[in-house]
Amino acid sequence: MKGFGNMMKEAQKLQAQMEKMQEEIAKKKVDATAGGGMVTVECNGKQELLSIKIDPEVINKDDAQMLEDLVLAACNEALRKSRELVQQELGKLTGGLKIPGLGM
């Protein structure tokens, strides 16, 4: 039973480390651009979009589709970078072991 007690302590320690890491990851930010920097999106480690900046030069009322595509591309890239950041940070805690459900 002593081994089980040690295992439980280690699990609690890992859980505390995980909670701390999730808080730290949530504070980190990534950004992505599209259209050569015409659209910039900022996202945090919780995959929440924080800001979208659009260069006025790209705004054309006759071609809204192009702007929509640029915003979508920048958002998707920012979210991809955020997921990658989470995996890298969690990999430090898990030693690179991919554990299902450990993402944020």
Outline where the language-model segments fall.
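Short, well-ordered turn and helix-capping elements at secondary-structure junctions
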Residues: 29, 36, 56-58
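N-terminal intrinsically disordered, cationic/polar leader segments
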Residues: 33-53
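A short interface-forming secondary-structure element
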Residues: 52-64
